Amino acid sequence: MLSKRQGGLQNRGIKNTFLMVRPPDRTGEGIRNVISGLTVSERQLGMVVLVALAFIGLAMAAAGAVRADPMQAHGFIVLLFSLGTICILLKGYSAPEPSEKRLETYYDDPSKFGVVIAMVWAVFGMFIGDWVAWLLAFPDLTFDAAWSSFGRLRPAHTTGVIFGFGGNALIATSFHVMQRTSRARLADQFSPWFVLIGYNLFCILAVSGYLMGITQSKEYAEPEWYADIWLVIVWVTYLLLYLRTLARRKEPHIYVANWYYLAFILVVAILHIVNNLAVPASFAGTKSYSLFSGVQDAMTQWWYGHNAVAFFLTAGFLGMLYYYLPKRAERPIYSYRMSIIGFWGITFFYMWAGSHHLHYTALPQWVQTLGMTFSVMLLVPSWIAAANALLTLNGAWHKVRDDATLRFMMMAAVFYGLSTFEGSFMAIRSVNSLSHYTDWTIGHVHAGAMGWVALITFGSIYAVVPWLWKRERIHSPALVEVHFWLALAGTLIYVFAMWNSGIIQGLMWRTYNDSGTLAYSFLDSMIAMHPYYVARAIGGLLFLIGAIVGCYNIWMTIRRPSASPALSSDTPLPANLQPAE
């Protein structure tokens, strides 16, 4: 039987569940409580996996030592990571079997971990990115160290922000959204932890490998063969967990956000496996050779690269947008039909668009034309999604004015519409002749990465943190305002600097004098770029400062005491009694 208070909360819906508060967990006690919440068999399985992983790390270290290969360092990283995680697991390993009552509530501990680690990766990745920006303006900032060269720092930046920040945020929010929209608890408690911890091990291997010079030299797919195999294991577990949870849903309808999340998970698995098909030079070394070569290798890489943008940086974050924006605005999606049309349009058209990255190359022209055509058609489903998000705010624009969290999401939708228009425009061959290989492309990418991906992620995290930790609100709404304006200013400075530098570059490279020779040398174009590169670094610095402000605000929200101690004895409503959110 529900208590009188529980019944009242049920009638008012999930909107008020974030008011149910509890004292903030101390770090040690919190970890112990999380581990003791696992069943004995789940703890045992976790220990078996970690011990096996430690032995794999030891074997990698030994093999690398014999060959004097960088795999030795990665072996020690895997070993230390496994031993450290084992020590954490031992904190609550001997706890008794948890009560079956835990199954009546949603399982949010993995989402909490994912949100926190996403913000850590955000600061790390953005710091490296801003370092790279200053490095391009002042090349001596390498300090004569090989690991600090552009070729090693740049993939560390992209992996840190795309896969570390973006990937952890997607995994954490997908667990949160899937449970609420399905009215079903995660299928088990071991899999989400395996996914999150295993995924972050992959990110650590990737970034540390780049700094040591371990790379396949494929953009967004730089990690070597053993890291790729590990990610396949982790990602298949993620896919199976998502499908198993959806299969046991109590809500008959699958909400559209889950469509986008599932497309993100499924297609990224396919892309990763195909593009990373390779033969190791030795199982005791890091080096491998792709199964593809020549123009086929280039086409496979950009089929992967552009669809990583499509399904990792677009579909997944549209799932985030379609849940958190209407929840925060307290408005239904403007048109559910538009969201479905946009989903199928993006899913079908994006798969064919990758070849526009290879205009004016050895790729057959008909393949280039095919990519250009589908890229232009992509504008329709992309703008459907952007318009649907903005029209959802009809009747709630006063909230956008007053609520910086909602403003993050609104501005993200605006940048999504702008960057997709720009992408379709730049895919046209005649336009691409000017933009190809210039900073215009960098500006376009960061309009999407900073303006769309980062802003929707920050907005969603600000929305979900009080709900996950049962706090009444974020620690400081004023700091959310500060973060918003720092992020927006940083994005605009960065993007406009790159648009200007890119167009100037393209024009200088194609300017001829009367004798038919180039009017400007390459060095002339580099000198002309310097003020824009400084502006880019300043814009990136503002964005980084905003992320640090966000980390502080989120941490203080987690640590802050209950604002409503009278409700501290309340417990969450059973999942099977909650309306789908």
What function would you assign to each model-found segment?
Residues 216-219, 361-364, 432-436:
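Membrane-interface helix termini and inter-helical loops of multi-pass transporters
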Residues 291-300, 435, 440-442:
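Active-site-proximal inter-transmembrane loops
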Residues 562-580:
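Short, highly charged, low-complexity non-transmembrane loops/tails of multi-pass membrane proteins
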Residues 222-223, 285-293:
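Surface-exposed loop and adjacent secondary-structure segments within mature catalytic domains
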Residues 1-58, 62:
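Intrinsically disordered, low-structural-confidence terminal and linker regions
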Residues 32-38, 100-113:
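Cytosolic juxtamembrane amphipathic/interface segments immediately preceding
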Residues 42-66, 71-96, 112-140, 147-214, ...:
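Hydrophobic cores of alpha-helical transmembrane segments in multi-pass integral membrane proteins
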